[in-house]
C-alpha cells in the first residue's frame, strides 16, 4: 500500500500559519515528541502528522500567494478552494474550503473574500468542467469587487492524487 499511496502524512509539517509572512526555514523532524496526537491518523498504519522541530530565520512576506479552485463537476462533487503561499521552497496551506452549491455567485464571492483575506495575487482555476466558464464568472466578480487578481486556467489530465503530489 505504501507504493500505491506515495504521499504520507509524515511528509507534511503541521503548524499554525501566518496569513502574510513566514520564517526563512521550517525544520522537519520525525522525532516521536513531534507527533501531533490530537490530529486523527487517516493514512496508513504508523503514519502521523508532525509539528516542526524549529522555525528558523527572519520572518518576511511570502514570495507568492495563490488560490487554487477546483470547480464542481457532476453529481455530488464539490467546488473546492485552497489558499496557498510559498517562500524559499516551502508551501504553506492557509485554508481549504468546499462548497456544495457548485459555482454560484455566493460561492465565488466567498472564495474572493478568502483571496482578499490572504492577499492572493493569482487564481488558478481547473477547466475540466465548463470549458472556462468559471473563469469568466470570476472575472465578472473581480471587476465588481475591484480586486486585482490574475487568472490562470489549467487543464487536469492526470489523477487528482498525482496532481496533489506533483504540486507538493
Residue ranges and their predicted role:
Residues 1-69:
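ATPase catalytic-site recognition across NTP-hydrolyzing enzymes
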Residues 58-59, 74, 116, 144:
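Generic structural signal for beta-strand residues in well-ordered domains
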Residues 82-168:
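Mg2+-dependent endonuclease catalytic cores in nucleic-acid-processing enzymes, primarily RNase H-like
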Residues 59-86:
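Gly/Thr-rich phosphate-binding beta-strand-loop-beta motif of the actin/hexokinase/Hsp70
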